[in-house]
Amino acid sequence: MSQTTTNSASETLGFQAEVKQLLHLMIHSLYSNKEIFLRELVSNASDACDKLRFEAIDQPGLLDGDGELAIRVDYDKAARTITISDNGIGLSRDEAVANLGTIARSGTREFFSQLTGDKQKDAQLIGQFGVGFYSSFIVADKVTVLSRRAGLAANEAIRWESDGQGEFSIAPAEKAGRGTDVVLHLRADEDELLNGWKLREILRRYSDHISLPIRMAKEDWDAEKGEQVKGDELETVNQANALWTRNKSDITDEQYREFYKTVSHDYDDPLAWTHNRVEGRSEYTQLLYVPKHAPFDLWDRDARRGVKLYVKRVFIMDDAEQLLPSYLRFVRGVIDSADLPLNVSREILQESRDVRAIREGSAKRVLSLLEDMAENKAEDYATFWTEFGQVLKEGTGEDAANRERIARLLRFASTHDGEQAQTVSFADYVGRMKDGQDKIYYVTADTFTAAANSPHLEIFRKKGIEVLLLSDRVDEWMLSYLREFDGKSLVSVAKGGLDLAELADEEEKKRQSEVAETFKPLVERLQQALAEQVKEVRVTQRLVDSPACVVVGQNELSPHLLRMLKAAGQEAPEVKPVLEINPDHALIARIRDASDAEFGDWAALLLDQALLAEGAQIADPAAFVKRLNGLLLKA
């Protein structure tokens, strides 16, 4: 942010570059839903009052005899202004510059990089990012903020002003009481907002759940003027009690949706929600939502996450990540505890037994919500899985107590339909298992295409055995914790000596034994030629169309995981693969008859192509091409 003009009374500063970009995008992308400006500004006013109430726990003098917190909305037809006022914590000069001139949050660059130019898609992203105060400029061509922070003198107030074009001014001001007035100077085409009925309708639709009273001047019909006229008496236009404290039967779905948009600053409706009052060892109320879209910063370790924490209806903090496990970090909402102390800190949250009980109970409640969605709203669950499936997979390692429940919620691609969409559950797989099959088979790879085309699948396709196709980065980590489902082991088709004995008849078993003996000389010859590169060479039953493949030991890291570790700059052990050959392939017959002079090249070529098929990089591509060309010329 750059300073452009300064004098003793006022200074003009430039908006942070990201703010300029956001203002432009927001005005053009969100205009069709312009009424959210009032929701956002009322939400900010409510937050300011919550913060004052919290700070006043330790500093009661901040209330200065005015403990009745409220929000007021007013309009002036002649001046063409709407004013949103609160008597909350207020802003100092430095806070005004930081909060109204910059976007001080992580993930800003990632947010802008995801914008597409498509108004509808960008509107959703902007909603996820949270437009807050800047939504004022959707309907206003100038915004004035008069604010005095609690604890400061009347002459220490500030006046902030901007037309949203790139700069703002800030100057000292006088203000009788603490709090903030946001004055919107409306654009020429926004006359419909200069109407008490219209403003009340917007407030009741978007902000009825705000726990503070929202007040407007009472209006009566003036027959002489032929219009509603404001009087001196104020009336409360919202219900003014926290939504989560009401009985569920008294809350409409629309009210639940609007509350979600307020606490999450999301532009879209939630996918699902759960509202419960818990009594017993720990007493608390939870209103938790599953969003419809993943936030752009879902994978940002420094991103804000967690739910709002209240204690006995007193706001304590945003983003209380300790109240839910990390794998449920996409959940938004409110938890109101009756047991935690009002002066609770983040450090206390980490150590509190009550918080552990809340976290465990909330995790179970969210999992129940997802189970219900998976069973009764398949389309909604498919949307959830597309957005948050990879995050939920983390729960298999993070939440041992709920691992089995999480496993039932997982979805995968599989050879059953060959589609990339992850729609197959473990229960689906088990329900389709062959007679005599007692294992769940899977393959991991860098991409879905690589997994679907893996040579390790050939025998399974031939026998009609389903294999799960895993290509998410989190899958290998998940599998290190998830070893079985419903008593059936999870087995990689690319690890160890594949044992399909339970699916083979006696004649097939006899043939396999005879083939292994017949090809023993070739196996020994290949083992000698490739002694530096492979741990073992053996005949396999897992191949049908490919001449060879590489596998690793049952307890060794998979090649896919080794590549991920190396790409992340972490140390990875050197693992020699096992080369398995297909005795029925014509190329193996050709190598079996190769002269000693050519055998070394054939052996190296066989290993390199097996590595390439697995997704690995070969050590010397130039040598590979040279060998290939030489052997082709001799063919």
From Swiss-Prot:
Chief localization: cytoplasm
Pfam families in the cross-refs: HATPase_c_3, HSP90
One GO MF term: unfolded protein binding
Annotated spans, A: 1-346
Disulfide bonds: none
Record's keyword annotation contains Cell inner membrane: no
Location relative to the cell: Cytoplasm
Keyword list, A-Z: ATP-binding, Chaperone, Cytoplasm, Nucleotide-binding, Stress response
GO CC terms, sorted: cytoplasm
Keyword Transit peptide in record: no
Region feature (C): 564-635
Positions of the UniProt region annotated as B: 347-563
Function in brief: Molecular chaperone. Has ATPase activity.
Assembly and oligomerization: Homodimer.
NCBIfam families per the UniProt record, alphabetical: PRK05218.1
Protein family (similarity comment): Belongs to the heat shock protein 90 family.
PANTHER family: HEAT SHOCK PROTEIN 90 FAMILY MEMBER
Descriptive protein name: Chaperone protein HtpG
Naturally occurring in which organism (per UniProt): Bordetella bronchiseptica (strain ATCC BAA-588 / NCTC 13252 / RB50)
Gene: htpG
